[in-house]
Regions:
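Conserved helicase motor core of SF1/SF2 NTP-dependent helicases
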Residues: 1-179
């Protein structure tokens, strides 16, 4: 089979070896089976899950570094974005990527933090009803020590970091705070 376009969603969470079959796919006459790829993702959100440390996944070969492959934990999306944005001053590279600026998932209060911390204030709320609703405190919790936190969409509760010998996937202190 041959496809004009392959759309890869959440591409920042997919490592290159996982895409290799698609990237190298050939049709019966030996031509590319996929005409072009569209990678959709957000390099400022969750990366691919890799259990190796930064040093274990580091690329040392100069020939691979010359194509922007510095760490095996980076997705193809991240590598291509880094390469193109490094040459952003060129008019031809500006057409390779864009940013969706309207979001319809998060409540406006929740979106405020990532909008300013990661997106330079470029995100706009679509204005859907669920983005504007107020939080109501459940009956019986009016005197709870965390009542003000429970009606806030965003709060910071400091936690104790886990010791390096424990799994990076578990933080008992954070679990206790949220339970």
């Amino acid at each position: 089979k041959t496809f004009d376009v392959a759309i890869v969603d959440e591409a920042t969470q997919i490592l290159e070896p996982q895409l290799l079959g698609l990237l190298c796919a050939r049709n019966v006459v030996g031509n590319n089976a996929i005409g072009k790829f569209i990678l959709i993702g957000d390099h400022k959100q969750l990366p691919a899950v890799v259990l190796q440390s930064e040093s274990q996944s580091e690329v040392c070969e100069e020939c691979l570094q010359s194509i922007g492959l510095y760490n095996l934990k980076d997705s193809l999306f991240e590598r291509l974005y880094r390469t193109v944005s490094a040459n952003h001053s060129s008019p031809t590279t500006q057409r390779f990527y864009d940013m969706l600026c309207r979001q319809g998932r998060m409540n406006v209060e929740v979106a405020r933090f990532p909008n300013h911390a990661f997106y330079g204030g470029l995100l706009e709320a679509v204005g859907l009803p669920h983005q504007q609703g107020e939080l109501v405190l459940a009956p019986g919790l009016e005197n709870d020590e965390f009542a003000d936190v429970l009606v806030s969409r965003v709060a910071f509760l400091p936690s104790v970091p886990e010791t390096p010998s424990q799994s990076a996937k578990i933080n008992h202190s954070e679990a206790q705070l949220t339970a």
